[in-house]
Amino acid sequence: MDKLTIQASGALAGDVVISGAKNAALPILMAGVLAETDFVVSNVPNLRDVNTSCELLRCLGAEVSRSDEGKITISTTHLNEFCAPYELVKTMRASILILGPLLARYGTADVSLPGGCAIGARPVNLHLHGLEQMGAKIEVKEGYIKARVDGRLKGAHIFMDMISVGATENLLMAAALADGETVIENAAREPEVIDLANCLNAMGAKISGAGSDTIRIQGVESLSGCEYRVMPDRIETGSFLVAAAVTKGKIRCVDADPKTLEAVLAKLEDAGASITTGEDWIELDMQGQRPKAVNIKTMPYPGFPTDMQAQFCVLNALAEGTATITETIFENRFMHVPELIRMGANMELEGNTCIIKGCELLNGAQVMATDLRASASLVIAGLVADGVTTVDRIYHLDRGYEHIEDKFKGLGGEVVRVS
């Protein structure tokens, strides 16, 4: 099993090209099921979860091809299977996003209950309840969600009990082919939801309000394929910016979108970073200074993203002062903390809050990645730790970061993959 070995590298410097957003690419690939003609998606990152999504589509009978330039073409002409099996779904929670498209276009879907990162309960009941309001008959049996509808789904007024990105996306795709208007209230406002809505509209859907808490979808009878470019990955961008801040460096993220990172950029400025932005780039300069501690509370977008929480744990571990980080989105999302403590971080957990007293130095150690973003935080910690850090179980990292070791090397980081 692959590992990463990391050594303290000094201040990161240079340009890093940001990949397409995993969390936008996955639902957009699933939306390919809705298209009656060939669907082409570009700027798709080369990641384990993307490969799993392509394998799932092939398992259903779709033809999926990939070019070297990150372009994926999907044809559903021969799609004739409607079951997403446990073997694929168990490795990636986003597989649940096939449910809405299959049901909307074909009237039937069997989807195994999902797996993915072990970061607490992420219930699927919001997905199921919304589809039931649109006329689906659903039962959960033998570990599978079995959904059926006679004819087309019907437009409905859906109020989400809690904000859920995945449920918003699933219902958005299902409603695109429903009969009549669907209104989703208390919808997720994340940029990835907007990207999916823009893609569906390019396919012929009639969606308005994405990015607000109320989305309106006027169902259409069919959708066509199109060519669509996935948005930049805001979490990858934020991860590199934090790495630069922790190493007291100066980097520029290109092919990025500053508008999607306002909460993160504000916290980096609070930490002492000088931030400059253009339309598609972000530059961070720490001017050789140690970061200042910053308090964080994760919130749904446009608040501070839960997917950046672990990285800011590392920043605060090395910052001047004391800070708290409160996690409000997921339970069990501080599994990186014991690993950082093994590296010398001064942290303690109280419920869903981590109290961090900054120290000047971390020590290299053998650590274990427990989920996707936790693994990124351990790599960042290794870049400033005294000695060698080895990160095990980096298959988590490969689910969400494209060529991470090569990108860090390009900035001067000593990060090596060992088989």
UniProtKB/Swiss-Prot annotation:
Swiss-Prot/TrEMBL catalytic activity: phosphoenolpyruvate + UDP-N-acetyl-alpha-D-glucosamine = UDP-N-acetyl-3-O-(1-carboxyvinyl)-alpha-D-glucosamine + phosphate
Family recorded in the similarity comment: Belongs to the EPSP synthase family. MurA subfamily.
Alphabetical list of NCBIfam families matching this protein: murA, PRK09369.1
Residues bearing the modification 2-(S-cysteinyl)pyruvic acid O-phosphothioketal: 117
Annotated keywords: Cell cycle, Cell division, Cell shape, Cell wall biogenesis/degradation, Cytoplasm, Peptidoglycan synthesis, Pyruvate, Transferase
Main location class: cytoplasm
Function: Cell wall formation. Adds enolpyruvyl to UDP-N-acetylglucosamine.
Gene designation per UniProt: murA
This protein's name: UDP-N-acetylglucosamine 1-carboxyvinyltransferase
Molecular function per GO: UDP-N-acetylglucosamine 1-carboxyvinyltransferase activity
EC number: 2.5.1.7
Xref: Gene3D superfamilies: Enolpyruvate transferase domain (3.65.10.10)
Binding-site list for phosphoenolpyruvate: 22-23
GO-annotated cellular components: cytoplasm
